[in-house]
């Protein structure tokens, strides 16, 4: 597939009822009949992820959730037994957790088995002295955080999708959370992992992330989107709940001055727990709807936290000086507090987009040298990709910062897309293609933390280069030679393979 081709949104034809029943019977011997679904019930109960692609295909009667059977293991041993069976029968397996992704990665487009990990929710070990915790992959992030908060602790990885996202899903997509600027993304939280390979081997990786015992294999599976192995548990770092939080908000004359303020903070060691910079359109038409503060242009919200108020105040003071040095005007701190209290309203009606709209939130990373050019090129490419008569809006903010750069969140929205599915996909794909290629050409990386999924798979070779893709394919072949795990995801389909191999499971 050329990197400019539309992603494949086809779903494999379902197994015959006989084959699906036979596969379900084999799985029931492993899990028990109450934890196996097949046929239309398997698809009805598990409709797919939260991407626009999933919603619009379902609306038009062409759903992307093509699983023939759903299997719900409760233990690592059961996961291993399911994978052994699947490998023997050459049946595709797609692991899934909360299905909160927005790229289509958790959709079982090749049919076969959807491995529902949501029953694996145990906290296996909590070490209060080392501030580490071993938790199973099906645990929902919000539930985990609430359990920790009751003990004065925090995971500090808290994505916008925390109410639905599973720990394993965050690991699979290399996710990020609202506090990442200080506490890091999921890769910084994960210390070790338990992984089941496609042949059923269970790998328990070293319990410490810093060692000289060869490569750090845990990180091989972070961001692998289920293609290399099934992560069944992870050991993660924890923190104490902060005793103090301090908010501030600033109005900049333009986005470039705001980016420079953020760069100066990050490169001087100042670490806000939250730093969100909104361009004019996002400040006026998104943030303002939540905080009601009369915002009229580029706005930055920052939050500092910690156990020692003197240190929190000192960092906030340095931030104030840096922002003032970039010409910013300080706004009332209640704006930041209002955002914090309402930070999840954006994901519910009336704030969240709904069909018949077309929407997509991209997340593109770049270093500080290139981030402004990436912002300009990507947002311009989005606007130029479609006729103005569609009334598309583009609203952008920067919310995950690093000591080397940041990322942009440009969300495009079209109030009403075409009634025809293929025409709607053409419109959506034209915008995504233009923005993705513009990001690459400007020196950016096409995704920061939402993952690749179906939407970005055609562009992986352009991002990695031919040699990089050959390396990734060699890793895939070494760990999953039969391509049982998520075939085709991460552009890792073997040559000549269709949407799903022909499978006739044994009765």
Predicted regions and their residues:
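Alpha-helix capping/hinge segments and adjacent helical runs
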Residues: 32-36, 433, 440-452, 477-485
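N-terminal flexible segment immediately upstream of the FAD-binding catalytic core
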Residues: 1-84, 102-131, 282-290, 335-360, ...
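Conserved, mostly hydrophobic/aromatic
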Residues: 86, 226, 480
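C-terminal substrate-recognition/cap domain of FAD-linked oxidoreductases
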Residues: 37-53, 240, 251, 257-434, ...
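FAD-binding subdomain of flavoenzyme oxidoreductases
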Residues: 121-276, 500-507
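Activity-critical C-terminal alpha-helical subdomain
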Residues: 201, 452-507
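Conserved phosphate/anionic-ligand binding catalytic regions in large, soluble enzymes, centered on
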Residues: 101-106, 170-171, 217-232, 401-405, ...
